[in-house]
Amino acid sequence: MRNHDLSPLLRQWIGFDKLANALQSTAEHQAFPPYNIEKSDDNHYRITLALAGFRQDDLDIQLEGTRLTVKGTPEKPETETKWLHQGLVIQPFSLSFTLADHMEVTGATFTNGLLHIDLTRNVPEALAPQRIAISDRPALNS
């Protein structure tokens, strides 16, 4: 599998500078659980975490200010398993994301071992970009 430097693309995320930096630093230090961040349009995003072996009750999602934290604490098995090969990792984790201003968590679902967290960017109308009409009239000072 190839790794690509996405930093030039991350610079285009207006309003997501903090998230891009946090993702880069998290990716360098955090290998579990694997996750994707999907952008469906300019205002809708989805974080998907692969959590095979976890139950919904093992997971906790908290939003404190702009810090979104997902924690997983799997239930300990009653009996010790003797592995011949262990390819699936089921271990406690804590993963944090720093969200941009005006981002809201709109929901979370856990289906088939995938945790989906939906995000929406709601920029107040007063802060949203406004289109300025260009007039044919001469400027006032000319």
Curated annotation (Swiss-Prot):
Domain sHSP, residue spans: 26-137
Domain of life: Bacteria
Major place of residence: cytoplasm
GO biological process: protein stabilization
The keyword Cytoplasm appears for this protein: yes
Location in the cell: Cytoplasm
GO cellular component, as recorded: cytoplasm
UniProt keyword terms in alphabetical order: Chaperone, Cytoplasm, Stress response
Keyword set includes Cytoplasm: yes
Subunit structure comment from the entry: Homodimer. Forms homomultimers of about 100-150 subunits at optimal growth temperatures. Conformation changes to oligomers at high temperatures or high ionic concentrations. The decrease in size of the multimers is accompanied by an increase in chaperone activity.
HAMAP family listed in its UniProt record: HSP20_IbpB
Family: Belongs to the small heat shock protein (HSP20) family.
UniProt comment concerning the protein's domains: The N- and C-terminal flexible termini are involved in oligomerization and in the binding of non-native substrate proteins, and are essential for chaperone activity.
Function: Associates with aggregated proteins, together with IbpA, to stabilize and protect them from irreversible denaturation and extensive proteolysis during heat shock and oxidative stress. Aggregated proteins bound to the IbpAB complex are more efficiently refolded and reactivated by the ATP-dependent chaperone systems ClpB and DnaK/DnaJ/GrpE. Its activity is ATP-independent.
Name under which the protein is recorded: Small heat shock protein IbpB
Organism: Enterobacter sp. (strain 638)
Gene it is expressed from: ibpB
